[in-house]
């Protein structure tokens, strides 16, 4: 999955990526989400250690949908999208960010959510060209 648009512009944008990633993982696929362009800013930590995604709360309707998807009780569903992305990373989805774009947005070494790994531009190109399936996001 290659993500270039800002993830924090709406609940729909933030959530739409999670469901297919989770479904592909649960079907036994190796999933890598490449954060590129403005998408990298969603994972920038502020002075309190929070990202913009930590400030996008999970809607009640999303909680109802995510509980069975994550196979957890409703109270255990994360209340924000930052934690949801961290769960994806812990469960085996590789979340990477284009190092060149990180530098362009002047995001320092300690300012990126630890769930995200940095890769250089050549690795981004390799990932998006050497795959069995490629899902650009947003889909137009």
PLM features: residue spans?
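Short internal beta-strands
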Residues: 31-37, 95-99
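Histidine-anchored nucleotide/phosphate-binding helix
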Residues: 12-28, 33
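Short, basic, glycine/proline-bearing loop/turn elements
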Residues: 2-7, 64-73, 107-111
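A glycine-rich helix N-cap at a beta->alpha junction
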Residues: 51-97
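Glycine-rich, aromatic-bearing surface loops/beta-hairpins
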Residues: 74, 116-117, 121-140
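C-terminal binding/interaction regions
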Residues: 103
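Short, hinge-like loop/turn segments at secondary-structure boundaries
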Residues: 49-53, 113-116
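Short, glycine-rich nucleotide/cofactor-binding loops
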Residues: 1-15, 37-47
């Amino acid at each position: 999955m290659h993500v270039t648009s800002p993830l924090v512009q709406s609940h729909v944008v933030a959530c739409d990526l999670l469901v297919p990633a989770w479904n592909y993982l649960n079907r036994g696929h190796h999933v890598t989400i490449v954060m590129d362009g403005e998408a990298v800013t969603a994972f920038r930590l502020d002075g309190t250690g929070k990202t913009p995604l930590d400030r996008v709360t999970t809607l009640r309707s999303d909680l109802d949908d995510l509980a069975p998807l994550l196979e957890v009780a409703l109270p255990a569903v994360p209340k924000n999208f930052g934690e949801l992305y961290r769960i994806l990373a812990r469960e085996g989805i590789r979340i990477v960010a284009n190092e060149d774009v990180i530098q362009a947005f002047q995001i320092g070494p300690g300012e990126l959510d630890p769930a995200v790994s940095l890769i250089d531009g050549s690795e981004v190109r390799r990932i998006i060209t050497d795959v069995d399936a490629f899902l650009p996001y947003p889909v137009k």
